[in-house]
Each structure stands twice: as C-alpha cells, then as structure tokens.
Amino acid sequence: VSSCKFSYSLFTPVLYPSKPKKNYLSGKPITAMIYRNRRAAYSNFILVFVAIKIALNLLSISNFGFHRDELLHLTLGDHLDWGYKEVPPFIAFLARMSLSIFGDSVFASRILTTVASGLIIWLTGMITRELGGKKFAIALACLSLILAPAFAASGYLFQPVVFDQLWWVLTVWLLIKYSNTTNISYLYAVGITVGVGMLTKYTMAFFAIALVIGILISKQRKLLFNKHALGAALLSLLIFAPNLVWQWRNNFPVAGHMNELRSTQLEHITAGDFIIQQLLVNGAALPVWITGFLFLLFSFKLRKFQFLAMGYVLIFLFLLQMNGKNYYLFGAYPMLFAAGGYAFDRILKTSRKPLKAAVIILFTVPNLLLLPLVMPVLPIRQTLAFFEFNNKNLPFLSFITKWEDQQQHATTQDYADMFGWQEMTALVAKAYNGLGAEHKPHTAIIADNYGQAGAIHILGARYNLPPVICLNSSFALWAPEQIAARYIIYVAEEFDDMKHLLPMVESYHSIGEVQHPFAREKGTGVYLLVNPKPALNELYKKDLEATRKK
C-alpha cells in the first residue's frame, strides 16, 4: 500500500499503483481498463431501471386527461416571459418546446416529464455508485424510488415538480463528484444547476442553502473555502437574475401568490400532518431511506457525505416551520435512497443472493400494489375501487384522498383535476358556435379560474375559440384592459359566482353544466351574457387593477 498513491479519474476516485502494469497489446494500464469496463457495466445496469421507469410512465400517462395545472403551464408556453405570478419561467420554456415538437395531446405534453423522471433514476443509480454501492445497492435504490408513491405521483404530470426534483438530485450528484475529485468544474456545474433550478421552482434556493450550511457545519467545510465556491454562487445568481428583475418590475407578484397560498392552503397543514406524511409518502420503501439517512449521519464509510444528511434535516425543519406541502421535500429523497441502497449492501455484504432478492421484494412489491392510488395505471372505475378499499382497510393512508379543503373525497384531488375539461370546453364551443358569424367578432370568453381558462386556451384551439379572459393566476398578466363585447360567454364554478353580474347585462342564457361525476369541476356552468352594460366593464377594470396589485 505504501508504494501506491491516489489518482482521481473523471468519474470516481480510484487507487492506482504508482507504476501500474500494462497490457502489452494496447499499452494501457490494466487497472484503468478494468475500471472503465466496470464503469460501463454499472452504467448499463442503471439503464435497465431507467427503462423500467420510462415504460411505466408511457403505459399510464394518457389514461386520464390534462391536469388543471398542466393546462396553465402549457398556456404559459404561449406567453413567454421571465416570470409569472406562481412559477418561475423554466416550465414555460419547456411548454413552448413541447408544444412545438410533440404537439398538444395529453401523451405529448408528458414526454418531457417522463424523460426527467428517467434522468432522476439514472442519477440515483450514479449517486449510489459514487457512494460505493454495487449492483444490489443500485437495484434497491432505483426500484425503491421508481415504485415509491411520492415519485410515482409526481413524476408524470407536466409541472415544475419533477424538474425541480431533477435539479435537486443533479446538485447532489455534482457535489458528491466534487467531494470525490475536488475538480472545480463540478462546483461550477453545481452553480449552473442551482441557477436553472431556481428558474424552475423557488424551493431550489432553500435546498441549496441547506446543503451549504450542511457542508459548513461538517468536516467537509474545506470544500467551500476557495474562490471557486463564490464564483459558482455568483453564476447561480447571474442565471437567476432575469427572474429577479422581472419580479421587481412587476411588484414581486410571487409574494402575493405565496400569501394567498398560505391563507388558502398551507394554513391547513399542521406540523404533525407534515411529519406523518413524510413517513408515509414512500410507502414500504421507508426503511430504505431511513437507513440511508442514518448511514449518512453516523457511518464512518460515508463520513465524507454527512453534509447530505445535515442538509436534509435543515430543509425538513424549514418546510416544517413554513407549513410546506409534503411534495416540497420529495427532491431530497433520491440521495437517501441511494445511501440506503449502499447501507443495505454493506449490511448484507456476506448474505446470499436469495436473501438480497427478498429484501428488494419486501421494500418494493407492496408499493407496486399502491400504484393505482397515485398513478393512472388503471381505468377510473377500477381506480375508485382501489380508493374505496384503501379508505376502509388502510385508514392511515386516507390523506391521499384528502383535498385542499381538508375533506375526504372519492378520489384524489389530482385525479379529480384531470376530468371535465373536454366537456366544459365543448359547452363553451356550443355557446360560441351558436352565435351568428356577424356576432362572433364581438364575443368575449371569461373564465373564473386558471384551470378553466387553460382548458379553453389549449383544448379550444380545435373549435377556433377566441382568446379567453381570466383574472385568476398568471392569466391576469395578459388580460385586456377592458371588455368591449356584446356577448360574453362566462364560465363560473357556481351560479352564485356570477349572480352579481346579472343586473349588468340585458339577458343571459344557461348553456349547460359539467356533469362528469369524478371531476372537481362538476357543476361548473357555462352562461351566455347578452349586451353587457358599462357597469360590467367598470367592475372588470376595478378587479383587474386589484388583481395585478396582489
């Protein structure tokens, strides 16, 4: 050993002899050749699990319709800017790309999220390998992640969530590579990733801060004691700067959005709910990530990466204090699954293959049975039967069907948000096409909420509907300054929501209501308002001004 020295390759630290033997046919060091072959073997092995995840997504992503949030995010793609009221701009750029390349079908809109999900699995396998795990560790970590309810539920919808998770996992992998190699290029890659991550979801900033503090209070603090750490931080801020400028120019609408979110949703989340849900969201894979967390915190073998466990604790406590939603923390679990795979690999190092296979089955197969609860792998009727069984026999999982109103429902809020949009848009088209050709140019469409407006924008294209007006969410940013129309097609969640408008119009006609039994929009009505009076336009301008000031 004394005659050897450490030499770092691009991918992992390897102990090379000072004068390695050579293969005399190729002239290359034998140890380097063995390492490259081994690296390729592990890469190919990880690709198996990437393929499993992608296949699972492709089999299920078109079973239900668009989610309410997906319709908003796709609409943002037609209104590109450096910021929006509820999200940073990255999802809008992806929407523009997706619509341009793949089209506007449900299946097409979820292709990029499926790719992101596959990359998360790839990086989880690579992190496991970097920690020192072999094939059993990789298999346990990747399968646990693929079938964990948290990641099955969040890994297929066109939302910032899955891309946020991707940047979290990529940041962790790059930090581990930097720790293993001290190659500063990885540090600058971290800076780029954090910058893009903050353009995806603002929670990236909190995770990055948690990791930095975790490093500073660990024995690895020397990793940040150089000018390149500051350079990486400045690079992140430079990438994120356009959104900061946009927020400043628009009076920081994200602050208003967060206040509204806290008052309408987050205030219902208790600390106890958050803790319990973190223990339940990964289902049977709980022992894997818990063991990984403990190994990162206390294991001598993983002492270099103790800062990851500290970072998890810090971001957990922050979200607990802020009444964060359970999925805000999902991006931190792949690193714990990777560490858990390594931990069980060490624990079962001398065990036979049947025992290792049994461990994988124990921590993954039960989650396979839970998939219909979080991912549309079955038709809706069979899925509802699963929910009924779940609520009767597994009451500790009843939070799955608890909506933001804190009431229990027949299905999850996410599933309910995927139904009724085609029906609603068809009613709007019925009202619009029922007007004479001479009246259509003088017709406006108004929707109560962003889901309705997004559906009319995306699904209404086939009916040649005019642009929809909505003062909810980011739609208010491009809403017209006034309504100059003789006819208004109004989409209201409830009739009571528009009763105050009736004295401001000459007459109105009810076109119909959404009847889908499982839709969150069930009961949403479509109305034709005829000859609005000036008072309606004045009310609209007042509401628009108030909305933009929030």
Identify the meaning behind each predicted range.
Residues 129-132, 171-187, 294-302:
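Membrane-interface transmembrane helices that cradle and orient dolichyl/undecaprenyl
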Residues 79, 174, 186-201, 236, ...:
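Membrane-interface alpha helices of multi-pass inner-membrane proteins
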Residues 196, 205-305, 319, 372-377, ...:
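Transmembrane-lumen/periplasm boundary regions of multi-pass, lipid-linked membrane glycan transferases
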Residues 59-73, 83-95, 103-107, 251:
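Extracytoplasmic catalytic/substrate-binding loops of multi-pass membrane glycan-assembly enzymes
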Residues 47, 111-132, 170, 174:
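Transmembrane-helix motifs of polytopic, lipid-linked glycan transferases
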Residues 150-164:
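Short acidic/glycine- and proline-prone juxtamembrane loop motifs at membrane-interface regions
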Residues 50, 141-146, 194, 198:
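Short helix- or helix-capping micro-motifs
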Residues 39, 43-44, 124-147, 165-166:
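Transmembrane-helix signature of polytopic, membrane-embedded enzymes
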